[in-house]
Swiss-Prot record:
Keywords: Glycoprotein, Membrane, Signal-anchor, Transmembrane, Transmembrane helix. PANTHER family: GLYCOSYLTRANSFERASE-LIKE PROTEIN GNT12-RELATED (PTHR12270:SF50), GLYCOSYLTRANSFERASE-RELATED (PTHR12270). Coiled coil: none annotated. The gene is gnt12. Belongs to the glycosyltransferase 8 family. Highly divergent. GO terms for molecular function: glucuronosyltransferase activity; xylosyltransferase activity. The keyword Transmembrane applies. Residues 1-36 are cytoplasmic. Its main location: membrane. Residues 58-550 are extracellular. It is found in: Membrane. Glycans are attached at N233, N322, N426. GO terms for biological process: protein O-linked mannosylation. This is Glycosyltransferase-like protein gnt12.
Length: 550
């Protein structure tokens, strides 16, 4: 029998140990080589997790409409601040916005409004833009901001009166469905107070319009007060540019207007090419409206016989009242008989268009606009029938006379009281913004435009303050706005209240049934504006009414 030497066993043992050590070392080396890859995977996972958490938080913010509690408001300094949630649910404390505004004026709006600037911020950066549109959007007309954005294609600062969560949903629904809105429109929210239906100063009951007081309580609640100038100021103060064009939501600008306005500012105001020697300059955009569409197709019969003059009736005395009535009856019957027997009646057609115009039919050039006005009768000058003096300083005859002129320059006009234009101006030059005592009145379920209400002193008083500050007004010859009327069968002068109020302002007569805003304008805003601009409040500047004529 042979035996292996002992040292061979030792060698085998050593070899086994060496093999085991080599395996361990190899595994360690592999682990070292795989470690960077494992770190990379961990980093990717962490980054993905962070993005997911951020996305979840943003989605939650959008879902809650980014409304936070008021944390830094001194309640003692803001006694009129209403801290109830906008949906009147006291248990939901997350519906209160983070800012507030309070009105402390003597007359007009006196309640506090909470607001949220940039509730939605436009995706497009404002760099490279010089002009912004400033507007306010009644929730019923929300889709019209998309029409403006499609044409303007530049920054828009828009404020919305929010009364409930459904209003907020409507805004974000529009943002999701309109690329132009999501790119260019900044939305600011002004939140409705739960008792904002009674925001008129109760100490001034004599300014309440008696025409609107009804014995039926339910009828009186069909209207709500709309803080139009508060909304305008919210948009104005948060616009991204100094030069702004203020318009209402139911007015569409002409195509290419932004490029034209930017070009006009450069050629008119640059030191090397300055055409206007004034530091305070405002440009007027002429305004038009669609001619009302008639639902009547039959001709109208008009008699050539003139009615009995009212002056003849004033000469009669109270004792001869019965005799006068008898005489009037005889005269009327004689007139009718004469007209019937002599065939003095004439037949004329109703001078109203039967075609409905939508935004795609609007004129793209000034030549087309002229055709729409004078040939087709589809468009007319704004407020031509209801308030002629509100637009007359624009001088539309001169405006159309420049139609054949190549690159016409803006022409200067003289301001006069009651002028109510849409303006392009530099907000950094203003001493006064829109007076927030002014309000409008809307039907609670209205789908009407913002211009169908009876209180139209929001822009009139603002333009007066600019004129008293020393602004000069220039008409833009190649820019215009067209109001898209909502009512198809509207005579444009059916606002009897408007005519009455404009006559009050214009003729300075003493009528007991004042409009609320007329009282505020005449007694407070006009003299306040004169004092701020170092003028005597008891002297007329532009034939405006004085306080003793209100």
């Amino acid at each position: 029998m042979s035996y292996l030497p002992l040292y061979n066993n030792n060698n085998n043992i050593n070899n086994n140990n060496n093999n085991n050590n080599n395996r361990i070392n190899n595994n360690k080396e592999k682990g070292v080589k795989n470690k960077p890859f494992q770190i990379f995977i961990s980093i990717v996972f962490i980054v993905f997790l962070c993005f997911f958490l951020i996305w979840s938080m943003e989605a939650k913010k959008d879902k809650n409409i980014k409304i936070n509690k008021i944390s830094n408001i001194d309640q003692k300094n803001s006694p009129n601040l209403i801290n109830e949630p906008i949906n009147n649910n006291k248990n939901n404390k997350n519906n209160i916005p983070k800012n507030h505004k309070q009105f402390k004026n003597k007359k007009g709006l006196i309640k506090s409004f909470q607001y949220e600037p940039f509730a939605y911020k436009a995706l497009r950066n404002e760099d490279g833009f010089e002009i912004s549109i400033v507007t306010h959007v009644p929730i019923e007309n929300m889709e019209k901001i998309a029409m403006i954005a499609d044409i303007w294609r530049a920054p828009i600062s828009a404020s919305v009166l929010i009364k409930n969560k459904n209003d907020i949903d409507s805004v974000y629904k529009l943002i999701r469905n309109s690329l132009s809105v999501s790119e260019f429109v900044d939305f600011h929210f002004l939140y409705w107070n739960e008792d904002s239906d009674s925001i008129i100063n109760n100490n001034n009951n004599n300014i309440i319009n008696k025409n609107k007081i009804n014995t039926n309580e339910e009828d009186n609640l069909n209207y709500y007060y709309y803080p139009i100038n508060s909304l305008r100021n919210l948009s104005l103060k948060n616009s991204k540019t100094d030069w702004i064009l203020t318009i209402d939501i139911d007015y569409l600008p002409n195509y290419g207007i932004y490029q034209y306005l930017e070009r006009t500012l450069y050629t008119s105001l640059q030191p090397s090419k300055k055409l206007i020697n004034s530091d305070l300059v405002s440009f007027v955009v002429p305004s038009f409206q669609l001619t009302s569409i008639s639902t009547k197709t039959a001709p109208t019969t008009i008699s050539t016989q003139s009615p009995t003059p009212i002056s003849t009736l004033k000469k009669t005395t109270l004792e001869n009242k019965n005799k006068t009535i008898s005489t009037m009856s005889t005269t009327m019957s004689t007139t009718t008989t004469t007209s019937a027997t002599t065939n003095t009646k004439i037949t004329t057609k109703i001078n109203k268009p039967l075609k409905k115009v939508n935004r795609y039919d609007l004129p793209e050039t000034k030549f087309q606009l002229q055709t729409f006005i004078y040939d087709d009768k589809l468009i007319e000058i704004l407020n031509k029938k209801s308030c002629l003096k509100c637009q007359s300083p624009t001088n539309y005859n001169k405006w159309f006379s420049l139609i054949d002129t190549t690159n016409p320059s803006p022409y200067k006009i003289e301001y006069s009281w009651m002028y109510d234009p849409y303006l392009l101006y530099n907000k950094s030059q203003l001493l006064e913004f829109y007076d927030e005592r002014i309000f409008k009145e809307y039907p609670s379920s209205s789908t009407l435009s913002s211009s169908t209400t009876t209180n139209d002193y929001d822009k009139i008083s603002f333009t007066f303050s600019m004129a008293s500050q020393g602004f000069q007004f220039f008409i833009l010859p190649d820019a215009w706005l067209v109001k898209m009327n909502d009512n198809e069968d509207n005579d444009n002068d059916n606002d009897g209240n408007n005519n009455l109020i404009f006559n009050n302002l214009n003729n300075n007569n003493n009528n007991n049934e004042y409009n609320e805003n007329f009282y505020i304008v005449c007694n407070s805003i006009l003299p306040d504006s004169k004092i701020k601009n170092n003028h005597n409040p008891h002297k007329k500047l532009f034939n405006e009414p004085l306080t003793n004529e209100c």
